Amino acid sequence: MTKTLKIIEVKSEIGAGTRGASLGVDAIKIAALDFGSRFFKKHKSIEVPNENHLLLEGTGSPYAKRISGILTMVERVSDQVRTTLEEKEFPVVLAGDHSTAAGTIAGIKAAFPKSKLGVIWIDAHADIHSPYTTPSGNMHGMPLAMSLDEDNLESKVNKLDQETINYWFQLKNVGNIAPKINYRDLVLISARDMEKPEEYLLKKNKVKIFTTADVRKRGVERTVIDTLVYLDHCDLIYVSFDVDSMDPTASRGTGTPVAQGLTEREAGKLMSGLITNQKVCCFEIVEVNPTLDRENQMAEHAFEILIKATNAFRNE
């Protein structure tokens, strides 16, 4: 079945610790032009207004930097994803930093509140910190905690002020559904850089993780099958792809590169394999940062993965 794509552009980077991720969406568009592709002409797109002006101001809470702006962005992305799904279109989210993924998840739940949502998180990081456990305060490390309604107080290291506590509560409750996903409905792929509080949660909740080594040992096709079988009880599936899941040898054009990642070919096969599943209702590519790159390599890789994925479900 051919799906009508709608590209949702989220040029936000207030959740990241390094600057430049907000330029990633346009870098992917430039890569498309360089490849002579009409992809961005063929599919309609909408840009979500951003709060990047906050980068010129103070960070606010040291344990939840620019949290007021993050809340605004999560709400805006949620509204746009919900509207897109309600209009029977397939949202393809191209975003800067990964914090706004909490908005993508919130939007899917707003459109389908009674559906069980599975999440496939392809990322070097678990992104499951809360303001109570974060070592950096950068909120692109927290979207899954927002969606899981997770404070992880057992691993608490930071004392929060009341304003931060209030904003964090609001973030977890965007759309008045909390939690939006469950640990049993989550699969991490290529996760390899976690702190102790995150490892504690993943172990405690028996989260399904396929490391890069697992992917290579099983093969991409088997990994796709095993992931989808594991999430077979879910009604809908959302796939979020952070380009830092790929190895830095492919490109360093992302804010938090980590060795021992996927190759561009493995990532492309993985995404195109997952996307063909009928339950997949949305996918996302995040964290391309052309300011850290050479010759726009990462954006080119991201665009190639985008094309492989969309071609897979459009049967082109």
Walk through the language-model features, giving the residues of each.
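Conserved alpha-helical scaffold segments that buttress catalytic/binding sites
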Residues: 2-316
